[in-house]
Structures are given as C-alpha cells and as structure tokens.
C-alpha cells in the first residue's frame, strides 16, 4: 500500500461538525478513486452528535427526540463528541474487496493503541469494534435437565458470523460480566474505496450513550481509556500513538486480492 497521508481536521475548540466531515470524506473518496490523492486518514473530534447506520431500528434512537444524523455506513447508532478520537481512513482496496479484512486491520490498530497505554483489549466474536472484556462470572451449579439452545448467539440479530476466528474472544453468553466497548467501528466501501472508520473513546462523557442502545447491543457497556486507567488522558497524548499504529498496520497490509474459486463446468 502507498504511504498513508494524515489530515488533522480539527480538535477541541476546532472540533468539526459531522456534516462538514462527511462532505470532506466524500470529496477525498472521489479524489482517491481517481488517484488524485494518496490513501488518506482524516483525524478529528466532533461536537456532540448521534449518527445512525443503515440498520438502526426506531427503538434504538434517543427516547427524548435528540436529533440523529442518518449516514451511509454499516452498523447502527452511536454517539460522537468531545474526548473521542475519530478516524476516517480512505483507502483504495484491491478487488474483490474484502470488507471484513479491512475492519480487522482497523481493530488491530486500536488494540495496539490501547495496549501501548496499558489497556488490554480484544475483538469479540460476532461483534465489530474493540472491547475490554468483562471479568469471568463464577461457575453456576447446573440445574439439571436438557437444554436445546445449543448456540444462543445465532439468534442474536447483532451476531455477525463473519467476525470469528482465533483472534476473537468468544461471544459473551453469560460467561463474563458485561463487556465494555472502547472503540466503535462502522465502515463503507464504494467503488473499491473505504469510508467512515473508528471512534476511540479517550476521555468522553459516556453518559451521552445512556440515551441510546449503542451499536444496537443491549448486553454490553461503554468505556474509555481514561476510565480504564483511572487518570486523565488527552487526545493530544493518543494522536501520535494512533498515527504510528495506523501507519504500521495499514501501510504494511498485504492487500492482495482474495483467491476466488472458479466455478466448475
């Protein structure tokens, strides 16, 4: 992959309104498709805003009628605001496009960023984003009888069977206390070029998530670097670390197209 260009759109008092950032994403996306610009990652903070992906249900929106911006990414509803580092990597991918591989690369970036700050995180089977796993729950005694619910996860609308493998922690079916999402992700690929990306909770006011069902997941919580570390953490601290790992993972990614099995005659 070509060298990754970073654009700092605005932080703190210069946080960027969501619509303005979305317009800039689309402008850069069109330019990247035409090879007028290199692969680019927009980095910024947003003023407080709720955004809803294509699969957001009405009952997952704020109950008090707080305005929501409907966007063309995958996933469901989330919140952006001060204290959250948002990144929009706009990259050209080979065809056939492997959306899950792109998502895994972004997750790997954020896992490394959190690790550098001393916070252990993981992927969770069936769920996008980066998570702090809940503590194990004490083994409960069996009540006897036959359970025919062999895999309750498959009945969960938010369980994505593509998100699995040895790099994923097992989906939490009661064996851990509440998992906590530290980095949300939602992406879109159009014309072979990526849009949208990640939102890492550095030091936000997480009470804003209380008005919604974040990412449509009812049995998990939200956390931040500051909460997990028990100290103040700033966007300025995290920004160079994020850029380092974005470069390391995305610039060195093996972007060979997947091998596609030929149809038999």
Curated annotation (Swiss-Prot):
What gene makes this protein? lipB
Q: Where in the cell is it found?
A: Cytoplasm
- Provide the catalytic activity annotation: octanoyl-[ACP] + L-lysyl-[protein] = N(6)-octanoyl-L-lysyl-[protein] + holo-[ACP] + H(+)
Any Pfam family matching the protein: LplA-B_cat
Q: What is this protein called?
A: Octanoyltransferase
The record's comment on protein family reads: Belongs to the LipB family.
Q: What Enzyme Commission number(s) appear in the record?
A: 2.3.1.181
Which key words tag this protein in UniProt? Acyltransferase, Cytoplasm, Transferase
PANTHER family this protein is in? LIPOYLTRANSFERASE 2, MITOCHONDRIAL-RELATED, OCTANOYLTRANSFERASE
Show the GO cellular component annotation of the record: cytoplasm
